[in-house]
Amino acid sequence: MTKITHEFELYGKSYRLETGELAKQATGAVVVSQGDTILLTTAVVSKERRDLDFFPLTVDFIEKMYAVGRIPGGYLKREARPSEKGTLTARLVDRPIRPSFPDGMRNDVHIVITTLSCDQVNQPDVISIMGASAALMVGGVPIEGPVAGVRIARAKAEDGSIDYIVNPTFEEAEASDLNLTVAGTKEYISMVECGADEVTEEDMIGALEFAQEAIGAFCEEQQKFL
């Protein structure tokens, strides 16, 4: 398979999607990055349809200490079960991806997101959603997509106006009174997760509308990549 790379910039931040070089035996594999935070996302789909009354989708988010230039310390120098953050990130990916599959899908689907590099500036969780969507679509899996996710923070300008920040850095998110994560397609929102400090209803609606617009932009970039 020929290596395909798509680089783009949205809302002041640089992104990269790449396929055709790693994990060639997977159904679909995409390396997604924001800055120097780099993730390998693989999707494997079984050929046989299982006789089940539920959709067997599994999402794993694997954090590697080498991604931040460290090795595990202590007596056991090996990485064991996922951290709480890893489990929550896997669920963050599962929630918007699961509804995108067709009704009656009973093939096993396993999505694995592995951190190759973490610059400790850009957050890896929301770009995992874009990586999972792109990996499925590269592999020809019939999903209703593309699917993308964004995190919205906000900052007050000197004139008192509010500026929304898409996929804020750790520092930008820490300074914001709004931490809104939204995922879906160009047409609809399928997942919302939020923490906020007395944000008005009007501001929340504005943030959701802005998030939907940003999701559409990321979906369009995935289509260019494919």
Segments from the language model and where they lie:
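Short, Gly/Pro- and small/polar-rich lid/capping loops
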Residues: 1-25, 29-31
